[in-house]
Amino acid sequence: MNKITNASRFLFEELVSRIQERSKAVGIAVAIVDRNGNTQYEKFFGYRDQERKLPIDEDTIFGLASVTKSFVALSIMQLVEAGKVDLDDPVSKYIPEFTNRNQKPIKVWHFLCHTAGFYPMHRTIINEIAQKAGLDENETGDFAFCEKIALEGTKAVAELLDAQTKENGGLIGDPGNYMSYCNDGFGLLSEIVRRVGGENSFAEYVKKHILEPLHMERSSGEYVCKTGSGCECGNSLQNAKRCHDLRQRLP
């Protein structure tokens, strides 16, 4: 690995600062790790909690957001390796709620590669599912480990995707031919993991089959960070104004 010089460090940090300003990011953590697992560079910009002026540091826990898809993909491939899932199987084999009506079968690998053919659509949000189902996290426990949420969410996602697979052709093209990013496709994949993997929730599967074997003790599939755990506060922009979301899911 090329050595990081003072000049390159300065240019890099200037770039990160510009990105932070342009994106209105409250805080950013950056690290460069070599192939041997040695940290060659780390730097923390801004706050994990802007209101309380708590800075980001090496112990700050971030939500993984869409990097969660990597855990979904790894889980699916573990089940493929175990002979429990076939990438060429139609998704409807594992998720019969997804009828995939009047279209060529959408297979497991299509969702993994974002090539199922769906147009971008409203993302299914767990809080919306809970509200419609009349579920309270104080009663059910963490939503990430709640079977009822998984079932209700699967039903909602399947209906949403099925609405595009109509006789008049609601897809971008035949499955496998076009790339179109699909969050909800990975939602159905995570449900395949839950149903086939033998755990009560996708989060529990990841905990037992990925995080614990790798000794990732500060990582979890929890939907909301526990207070005081060093989590970064979720932030979003609405009408160019910053607002707080729920505390981020633990990575």
What are these regions (language model features)?
Residues I4-L64, K84-D86, D162-G170, Y223-T227:
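Short, conserved catalytic-motif segment at the N-terminal edge
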Residues S8, F12, L87, K104, ...:
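Stable alpha-helical elements in mature extracytoplasmic
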Residues A25-I28, N36, I106-W109, E217-R218:
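Loop/turn elements at helix/coil->beta-strand transitions in domains of secreted/extracellular proteins
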Residues P120-R123, R218-E222:
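Proline-centered turn/helix-capping motifs that create local helix->coil transitions or kinks
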